[in-house]
Amino acid sequence: METGPSEEPSGRKESQEMCPPGLLVFAGSSEQDANLAKQFWISASMYPPSESQLVLRRDSSQRLPVARPRRSRGSENSHSSQSFHLASNKNRDIFAEALKIQESEEKVKYLQKAKTREEILQLLRKQREERISKELISLPYKPKAKEHKAKKVVSESDKEDQEEVKTLD
């Protein structure tokens, strides 16, 4: 964007019209630089575009016209409402059927999981029974653990204490 000497006066008028004096100060700059800077700041500011400024005229209205309901024959209107009800009933039937199918699939899935669980529990019971039977078979051949029956050594003072407690009762 170049401004020459012929454009300077018009540019100055535009900047003075668009921007009141005193708001923008460019001290120590040439007049051409000041005008360019003013034009930049004016264009960079967030003023709403002129298209968005609503101006109400006598011949213009800002509201869209309201749609009027069509008047049709009574038989056509009842026929369309019947077809709508039939379509909605069909949709309900389709949704109900889809829901039943989904529920039956879930039921089959859960029954399969229950069957798998029972098989696992049965296998664990079988393994436990086998382990117990093997332990019973090998029980006579296992070395007997020595039982440490340590004799209690009761000191005389403990005996005396016990006797005193008995006499108090």
UniProtKB/Swiss-Prot annotation:
GO CC field: cilium; cytoplasm
Keyword Cytoplasm annotated: yes
Keyword Cytoplasm among UniProt keywords: yes
Domain of life: Eukaryota
InterPro entries: HOATZ-like
Any one GO biological process: flagellated sperm motility
Summary of the function given for this chain in its UniProt record: Required for motile ciliogenesis and flagellar genesis by mediating the maturation of the glycolytic enzyme ENO4.
Protein name: Cilia- and flagella-associated protein HOATZ
Source species of the chain: Homo sapiens
Taxonomic path: Eukaryota, Metazoa, Chordata, Craniata, Vertebrata
Name of the gene this protein is made from: HOATZ
